[in-house]
């Protein structure tokens, strides 16, 4: 039977991608249905209890700048906040927070249940309704059919998921949850390229069986960082430390002596695992010269005794996991409460997607999260928001939107996936972005909130706060530009006390702030340049914009040159065999990838600058050279 009401957008899956997709579509005013196999696991942290990190924190800030949920949720659930790379430049600084799993899940569910235009329904999805290469709905486990103009797949590791512990394996979407086998079979019937990937998780330890007295503590930062541009530190719950232990030669011997019982090394697992989050087996074998690896013991929550040992993800048998855990300092008597495991699952080639994350072959079908070959909550959330907003736009007969590489880490993520694809779980790093000085955590709102408002993602409260911040930045910069001090002025001695070389000529507040030894806080503590802005976010922007002005201007010039290629569009139906002068290899790659622009084509491996020149000349001759606005 069909459900009585049609929807504009259906989201399948309630993880980090699905929840952001559902919130985005509903915020834009479209009638949205979120289908999940279990309402109680909405926003579940399946692996590590943390949000953010290098590259990942940037994505969280961008999701927040577009009105998303993740940053707000972690501000309410974070039990330890830190700025990583704090001593480095602003481009690579990143926020990371340990999370209380229960509080995080509660924050997500509360937001979902209070979002207008959003209905949540508990049923596993087993089929899609596809008519004439267009998705028009979904069918649940009990045969209930829902109609919609767009469907977003955010199914994580559930598609034909297989859990491995030692040489034993069984079907599962994650520990304690069933896999989605009928939906996996249905998707394999569609004209989509599918492969297998693998990820893993460590055993969880009972905190009461760990001797923390012999371990080093790691505390959060003070003052506490905040993730959301709308948040404040008073929202954070009680803060707790993490602890550090290490593997040792005994640990490594246990692992080496049991590799024949590892499903990875025994050839039982076919899927490729994450390069940047390897299992402890992989670390010991790949870095054989190292006699220890640092392991962070991270609390899973304020009301839980479970500890997440970050760094020993494993699929070795349970008895070997016990030996590994008990070989480390402080864990000699530790007890495991949940075994570690590896999981294999289906993923679909993201090169078959448009930059909007809509399928090139099934109209109205969007993919987001691990189904696209990524790993990590943050990567999933960012894709979910993009897929959700574009599903909403499609359902309203509007054109899709995707950020450029020069505009957001989300743009880098989507361009990498759709242009290059991936053969292993893709993780975001700042090193993947060529314009990272422009794509900082601190300016995510300046880059994206205006666009979020145009798209209908940003509410009135956030928009008012954003404009107030812009005004504060502009007013303060003008004040510093127009406030001067001369070497002979009474205030010069106070200024010189903060400088490595004294004033030799008249200088404005901005001139002084450009000096590497002068901070905004120091400058505004001087009588001549007081008072400081009360808006800390605006003050941070003033300092960064002034200090890095020259570098930022140079990078902006590079972006404008590159935009010419990015804006030169390629017809989706172009058969590159028509273009004389291209090599067979280039023709094959261009026909396979079907890039949307010259810029995208130039990033395909094997497509040379000469090939790009030939293509541009051919397009001009054919009268097909056109650029987007």
From Swiss-Prot:
Give coiled-coil spans as residue ranges.
none
The terms describing its cellular component in GO are:
cytosol
What SUPFAM superfamilies does this protein's entry cite?
FAD/NAD(P)-binding domain
**Function in brief:** NAD-binding protein involved in the addition of a carboxymethylaminomethyl (cmnm) group at the wobble position (U34) of certain tRNAs, forming tRNA-cmnm(5)s(2)U34.
Cofactor(s) listed: FAD
What terms describe the molecular function in GO for this protein?
flavin adenine dinucleotide binding
**Subcellular localization(s) per the UniProt record:** Cytoplasm
Where along this sequence does the record place binding of FAD? Answer: 13-18, 125, 180, 370
Q: Which family does it belong to?
A: Belongs to the MnmG family.
- Which residues participate in NAD(+) binding? 273-287
Q: Looking at the keywords, is Flavoprotein present?
A: yes
**GO biological process terms, semicolon-separated:** tRNA methylation; tRNA wobble uridine modification
For this UniProt entry, what is the primary localization, expressed as one broad class? Answer: cytoplasm
Entry protein name: tRNA uridine 5-carboxymethylaminomethyl modification enzyme MnmG
* Complex formation: Homodimer. Heterotetramer of two MnmE and two MnmG subunits.
Query: Which keywords does UniProt give here?
Result: Cytoplasm, FAD, Flavoprotein, NAD, tRNA processing
Name the gene.
mnmG
């Amino acid at each position: 039977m069909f459900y009585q009401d049609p929807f504009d957008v259906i989201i399948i899956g309630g993880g980090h991608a699905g929840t952001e997709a559902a919130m985005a579509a509903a915020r834009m005013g479209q009638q949205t249905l979120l289908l999940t196999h279990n309402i109680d696991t909405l926003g579940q942290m399946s692996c590590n209890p943390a949000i953010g990190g290098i590259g990942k924190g940037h994505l969280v800030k961008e999701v927040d700048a577009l009105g998303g949920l993740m940053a707000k949720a972690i501000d309410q659930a974070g039990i330890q906040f830190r700025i990583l790379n704090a001593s480095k430049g602003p481009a690579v600084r990143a926020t990371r927070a340990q999370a209380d799993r229960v509080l995080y899940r509660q924050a997500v569910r509360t937001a979902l249940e209070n979002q207008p235009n959003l209905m949540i329904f508990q049923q596993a999805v087993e089929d899609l309704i596809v008519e004439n290469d267009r998705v028009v709905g979904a069918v649940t486990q009990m045969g209930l059919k829902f109609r919609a103009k767009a469907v977003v797949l955010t199914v994580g590791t559930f598609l034909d998921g297989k859990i491995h512990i030692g040489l034993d394996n069984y079907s599962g979407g994650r520990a304690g949850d069933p896999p989605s086998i009928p939906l996996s079979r249905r998707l394999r019937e569609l004209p989509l390229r599918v492969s297998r990937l693998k990820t893993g998780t460590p055993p969880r330890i009972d905190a009461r069986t760990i001797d923390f007295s012999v371990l080093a503590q790691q505390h959060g930062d003070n003052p506490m960082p905040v993730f959301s541009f709308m948040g404040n530190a008073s929202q954070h719950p009680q803060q707790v430390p993490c602890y550090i232990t290490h593997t040792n030669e005994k640990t490594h011997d246990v692992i080496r002596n049991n590799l024949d019982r590892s499903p990875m090394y025994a050839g039982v697992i076919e899927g490729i695992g994450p390069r940047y989050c390897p299992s402890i087996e992989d670390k010991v074998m790949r870095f054989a010269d190292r006699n220890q690896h640092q392991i962070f013991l991270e609390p899973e929550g304020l009301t839980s005794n479970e500890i997440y040992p970050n760094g020993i993800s494993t699929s070795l048998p349970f008895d070997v996991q016990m030996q590994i855990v008990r070989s480390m300092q402080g864990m000699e008597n530790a007890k495991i409460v949940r075994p570690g495991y590896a999981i294999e699952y289906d993923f679909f080639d993201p090169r078959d997607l448009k930059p909007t994350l809509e399928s090139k072959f099934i109209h109205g079908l969007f993919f987001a999260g691990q189904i696209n070959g990524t790993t990590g909550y943050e990567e999933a959330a960012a894709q979910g928001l993009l897929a959700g907003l574009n599903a909403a736009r499609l359902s309203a007969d509007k054109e899709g939107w995707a950020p450029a590489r020069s505009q957001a880490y989300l743009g880098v993520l989507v361009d990498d996936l759709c242009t290059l694809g991936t053969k292993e779980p893709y993780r975001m790093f700042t090193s993947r972005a060529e314009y990272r000085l422009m794509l900082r955590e601190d300016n995510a709102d300046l880059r994206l909130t205006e666009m979020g408002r145009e798209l209908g993602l940003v509410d009135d409260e956030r928009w008012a706060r954003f404009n107030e911040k812009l005004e504060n930045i502009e007013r303060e910069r003008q004040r510093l530009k127009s406030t001067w001090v001369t070497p002979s002025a009474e205030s010069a001695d106070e200024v010189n006390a903060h400088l490595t070389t004294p004033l030799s000529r008249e200088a404005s507040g901005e001139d002084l702030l450009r000096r590497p030894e002068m901070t905004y806080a120091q400058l505004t503590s001087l009588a001549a340049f007081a008072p400081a802005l009360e808006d800390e976010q605006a003050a941070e922007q003033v300092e960064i914009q002034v200090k890095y002005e020259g570098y930022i201007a140079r990078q902006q010039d590079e972006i404008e040159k590159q935009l010419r290629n990015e804006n030169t569009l390629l017809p989706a139906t172009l058969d590159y065999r028509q273009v004389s002068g291209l090599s067979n290899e280039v023709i094959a790659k261009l026909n396979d990838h079907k890039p949307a622009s010259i810029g995208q084509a130039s990033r395909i491996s094997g497509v040379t600058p000469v090939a790009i020149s030939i293509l541009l000349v051919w397009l001009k001759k054919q009268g097909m050279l056109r650029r987007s606005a």
